[in-house]
């Protein structure tokens, strides 16, 4: 699994844990948490399109937590090299999928 997968999952987990309190130093519509500003962008982009922006996804440290859905990762047709959060049973689990899939994304920068 590529490094971008780990980064993407880390961002999704980070966004889900945000308190919702806006910091005084973040622009309007951004959320401050632990010294960084975060924003969810609802427009859908591939990983490569989102990566072209000037924002950092995370500190690029290795993941030490995994929450794969049952039977995942299964790399269908040797084409599923990215991960998204999926809730087939009401609980968010990881599922591998093609990297060209479109999803909302989160950007972050240090204050």
From Swiss-Prot:
Tissue: Expressed by the venom gland.
Keyword terms: Calcium, Disulfide bond, Hemagglutinin, Lectin, Metal-binding, Secreted, Signal, Toxin
The keyword Cytoplasm is annotated on this UniProt entry: no
Record domain C-type lectin: where: 33-108
UniProt GO molecular function: carbohydrate binding; metal ion binding; toxin activity
Signal peptide feature range: 1-23
Top-level taxon in the UniProt lineage: Eukaryota
InterPro entries: C-type_lectin-like, C-type_lectin-like/link_sf, C-type_lectin/snaclec_domain, C-type_lectin_CS, CTDL_fold
GO CC terms: extracellular region
Cysteines joined through disulfide linkages: 26-37, 82-99
UniProt short sequence motif Mannose-binding, positions renumbered to this chain: 72-74
SUPFAM superfamilies attached to this UniProt entry: C-type lectin-like
Location in or out of the cell: Secreted
Binding residues for Ca(2+): 80, 95-96
Biological role stated in the UniProt entry: Mannose-binding lectin which recognizes specific carbohydrate structures and agglutinates a variety of animal cells by binding to cell-surface glycoproteins and glycolipids. May be a calcium-dependent lectin.
Family per similarity comment: Belongs to the true venom lectin family.
Protein name (Swiss-Prot/TrEMBL): C-type lectin lectoxin-Enh1
């Amino acid at each position: 699994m590529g490094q971008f997968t780990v980064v993407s999952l880390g961002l999704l987990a980070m966004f889900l844990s945000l308190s919702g309190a806006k910091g005084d130093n973040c622009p309007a519509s951004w959320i401050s948490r632990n010294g960084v500003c975060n924003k969810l962008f609802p427009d859908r982009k591939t990983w490569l399109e989102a990566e072209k922006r000037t924002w950092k996804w995370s500190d690029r440290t290795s993941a030490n937590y995994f929450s794969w859905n049952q039977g995942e990762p299964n790399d269908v047709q040797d084409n599923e090299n990215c991960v998204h959060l999926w809730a087939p049973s009401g609980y968010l689990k990881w599922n591998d999928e093609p990297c060209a899939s479109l999803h909302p994304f989160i950007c972050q920068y240090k204050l």
